[in-house]
Amino acid sequence: TTYGFTIGGPIIKNKLFFFANGELQNTPAIANRWRASEDGVANADAYISRATVADLQKVSDIAKERYGYNTGSFSSFPSDNKNTKLLARIDWNINNNHRLALRYNYTKNTVWNAPNASSMDGGTRMSGSRTSQYAMSYANSMYSLDNLVHSLSFDLNSRFSATLSNQFLATFSKLDDVRGTNSSIFPFVDILKDNQNYISFGEELFTYNNAVHNTVWNIKDDVTYYTGNHKIMVGLNYEHQMADNQYLRNGTGYYRYTSLDDFVQGAAPEIVCLTYGYNGENEPASRVQYNKLGFYLQDEWNVRSDFKVTAGLRFDGLFFDNGDLMTNNAILDLDYNGRHIDTGKWPGNSLTVSPRIGFSWDILGNNTLKLRGGSGLFSGRLPLVFFTNMPTNGGMIQYQAQVNAKNAKDKGFTMDEFKGGILSTEALKQKLYDLGYPQTIKPEDGTVPSSICGVDPDFKMPQVWKSSIAVDYTVPVSFPLNVTVEGIYNKTLNAAMLKDWSQKDINGFTRFNGADNRPVFPSDATYTDEAGKSLPSAYMLENTSRGYGWSTSVTVNAAPAKWINLMAAYTHTVSKEVTSLPGSNASSVLNYLSTYEGVNNFRLHNGLNVTPDRFIASATINDKSGNHFSLIYETWRGGYNYSYMLANDINGDGYNYDAIYIPTDKQVADGSFRFVSEDDKTRFMDYVHNDSYLKNNQGKYAEPNSLYSPWVHRVDFSYKHDFNLNVCGAKHKLQLSFDMKNVLNFFNSSWGVSKHLNPAIGNEARILKYEGVDAEGFATFSTPESINGNTKTWTLNHAIGQCWYASIGIKYCFN
């Protein structure tokens, strides 16, 4: 449901004007489609989980009776998305030479989400999601993403003479991204069954005190001067940006039990985690702020009437403020193979130079055939959350306690300390204090957290070299018919990536025998301190120059009659990168990308957010009777991009994000790729032969983000009718509208619906399981029962956003 208004008009005739627009939208959605089973048997096609009604009710009752916690329903979940927008603008014609525009924007967007699929700390991440055929969670474990934006702008345009003009633009933006929940403060609890997620409850483990607050000031002044056949523009730009990041993963506590019986009996949990602020601070925050000063100049040179060259040069200086940081000397003393991490310093001041040149050539001199293009360096930004990861995980603001059997033993206790049930957040914090975990910290002493984040002192903001070439052709027919062919190429110069400095180089590691000969990480794969204790993971933000991309597009525009406009366009896109930075937490970004040689050895792969093929066509009709028709057809491939992976950790690096090797038929036949049984081999190879990606990439490791969802086809229709009215001698207009999205779906529920990964395969494409190494050093594999030659890779995505919907509108324009 959408409600909106638009109003505008003069405050002072021909001098001062106002405009306002508001919209309130409430969109039905389904954030969790899964439901509990009666018999413990999952049915992925029907979105029935193996988690039973009886077990879910038992856990909910125990949570209420034993701990006073309300889990919420396991059959009804919050889901509706809400969006509120407001725009207000004042335009002032000060005089003939000066115009001022003031604008205010407000946006609030709320979207509900199921709990994080499987991320956790202190142990092995499960392959099955917490809401899936394997597991269920409760309504109060859902969370909302609330995006709030306030922005103001002051835009003054001045003309001082026929050859000299100026634009002064100042903007202020306040952007707040926060999480909401219906849960009371309570630890998040995972209960496993058969070494897989089964039931989860509590406040979502990444929601408490999770917010990013960005404040941005931007001021620029551009002077434009015309002289002869040159248009020269010179400008200055100043930007100040500050980000406060609040991020307490496991901020209310985290428990993981290996079985339902362990939870019911109050047995020792497998893992306990808590992140807390020092000195009793319940809402710790980390801050990064920088100043950016830019100077740029550009010359548009009309060399001839049919040939124009545009050349420009931009200088950007970036200056970080170290005043919000403290060096953790305990971290600084750690020796990562001769490298040390100073969490009290941002990257040094840097200067980026970006030259650019472009041209436009009217080849025939009559605007019927144009060649245009350009090349240059372009700089961008990086979300500041990747910087605030350093103070957040620098051990000076908050402490991340991750307790399991191994590190408990290192500290001189056992997991039996946590027998007897779940402690409240405050009681758990006190328990950790009693076990020797720090309550306060001094910079000169410092402490070593479970994991560390840092930024390379020489880190630079992203920069690419971009080149393009295009041809615009007007076809010599009796009506306007234009064709444009364009190609764009991008080469990465500086992109952001993460590396774990604690990991040793894989050169020299033992490898499996056979076709899948990936390295095997030994027990001493990480660097150690002088006492022989493994150093914590050190996630370092660095630069890489690896990566490129290109796209080609063809666009046709035609107007065969005055009352109709036609358009068609096709775009093919390729993007290769080292990482898409999926997420905001450093460990998630690094560890949750499929690889076969470990987290520091990513190969170039397809970008996560790429739609490789897209075609769109439209027809717009406007007749003399006030009727306006619009028909849009769109089809694309991709949008849901997956990576074929193993169900478990084959290389021993501690992360279950290992790409599968796709064997050839010969490698399977001659035993260089081995299965534990003939049945596993037959079912897997039958699936390979029936899946186009696997079949076309046999003999290779599966590339991340390369399993693209199939083509989807959509048609949208719009009709508007204008009623011209004469009210008290003034011309008014009343417009009625009818819009229908995804028209095909109205006629057939499977038409116009995109496809995503078949739930029978899982929410991640894990189609093989490592079963150990045989006596000859070959890795052996089994195939999940759901995988065979008849298994469909894709299934219809039954989501509200895939359905048709229609809207009726009314608009009244008056003078």
Task: Walk through the language-model features, giving the residues of each.
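Hydrophobic, lipid-facing positions within transmembrane beta-strands of outer-membrane proteins
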Residues: 1-5, 84-88, 148-154, 170, ...
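Transmembrane beta-barrel wall of Gram-negative outer-membrane proteins
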Residues: 2-114, 144-172, 355
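Short loop/turn motifs that connect adjacent beta-strands in outer-membrane beta-barrel proteins
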Residues: 12-15, 97, 162-163, 225-231, ...
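Transmembrane beta-barrel strands of outer-membrane/channel proteins
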Residues: 20-24, 102-106, 168-174, 234-240, ...
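Solvent-exposed loop/turn elements at secondary-structure boundaries
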Residues: 324-354, 358-540, 710, 728, ...
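Extracytoplasmic gating/loop element in the C-terminal half of outer-membrane beta-barrel translocons
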Residues: 434-446, 626-728, 735, 760-798
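Gram-negative outer-membrane beta-barrel transporters
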Residues: 484-643
